Each structure stands twice: as C-alpha cells, then as structure tokens.
Regions:
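PAZ/PAZ-like end-binding module
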Residues: 1-181
Length: 181
C-alpha cells in the first residue's frame, strides 16, 4: 500500500510541475496549440483518475503504466524546453565571454601603449580583436537564427555545438596570445 501511495504522489507531483512548466514564460511558443491542448487534456485525465474511486488506483501495475505513459508525453515537452533554454544559456555565456575578451585585450593594448607590457605587440592585439569581431558576427548570426526559429521544431543547433564553439574560441585566443596562430 505504501508503494501505491508513493506512486500516486509521485505522479501527481510530476503533473503539477509539468503544468507549471507548460505555463511558464520559457515555454511560450514551444508547442503549437494542438500539442499543448493534447498534453493538458492527458494531464487532466490522469489527475481525474488519481482522484477517482477507480479500484485500479490500488493496482501498482496500472499506476506504473499510467505514470510511464504520462512521463513519456511530458518528457517530450520537457526535453524541448530544456534544449531551447540550454541553447539560450550557452549563447549568453558565449556573449559574456566575447565581451570579457574585448575588454581584456583593450586593457592589454593600453598597457602596451604605456610600455608596461612587452611580451605582446599591438599587431597581435589587432589580430586578436579582428578574430573576436569575426566571432561576434558569428555569434550574432546564431542568436538571430535562434530568435527567429520555429520553437515548435527541434533546434538546428544544440548546447554541445555552442560549448564546442566556446572551447575552440578559447583555444584560438590562447594560441594567438602566445603567438602561435
């Protein structure tokens, strides 16, 4: 009986959290009306069943089946939500990195001009700044793609792609700074 109650509570909790996420600001535009309507309808049916007097409520196998089916539907939604949200977070991380590098190398340029930094040249700083600007243009193009993308479809870029962009960017900056590129 404890297992049945735990399953019921888990399923109910899952549905409440899923409903909150469906109605969140981050979820706007992720699903077309029909998809959202179908998901909400299924959640409502399961919640009604959980509060009914159906004897199957005490059948652990029926509860497992309902839970599995509900989570399968909900996880499709959550996966899409996390994909799009993750992309935005990593693009923001990339943007921050680009601004930080611009500021850092502007500071380095000033140090070179004042004669405080002798291990780097203005030419190197200029090459690095050109590279950063090129990456800024790439970044802005990616942001534009994401902003205009149909959020009801799978993203054309994923978090791993952006993470790789960040790593390659950092590697290239480090090489340029050391005069290797």
């Amino acid at each position: 009986m404890k297992e049945v109650i735990a399953y019921k509570n888990d399923l109910e909790d899952y549905i409440y959290k899923l409903r909150d996420k469906i109605n969140s600001e981050k979820a706007k535009g992720l699903f077309n009306d029909k998809e959202k309507e179908n998901l909400v309808e299924e959640m409502d049916k399961v919640m009604q069943w959980l509060y009914s007097n159906d004897e199957d409520l005490y059948n652990i196998h029926k509860l497992e089946e309902k839970s599995k089916n509900m989570k399968k539907l909900g996880d499709i939604f959550l996966s899409k939500l996390y994909d799009w949200d993750g992309i935005k977070q990593y693009l923001t991380k990339m943007e921050t990195l680009l601004y930080e590098k611009l500021a850092y190398f502007a500071s380095m340029e000033e140090q070179i001009k004042r004669g405080e930094k002798k291990d780097m040249t203005i030419e190197t700083i200029n090459k690095i700044n050109e590279y950063i600007q090129k990456e800024f243009n790439n970044f802005e193009a990616k942001m534009y793609e994401i902003d205009i993308a149909d959020k009801t479809k799978e993203p054309k870029i994923n978090v791993n792609d952006i993470e790789n962009m960040i790593n390659i960017f950092n590697d290239n900056i480090n090489k340029m700074e050391k005069g290797q590129k």
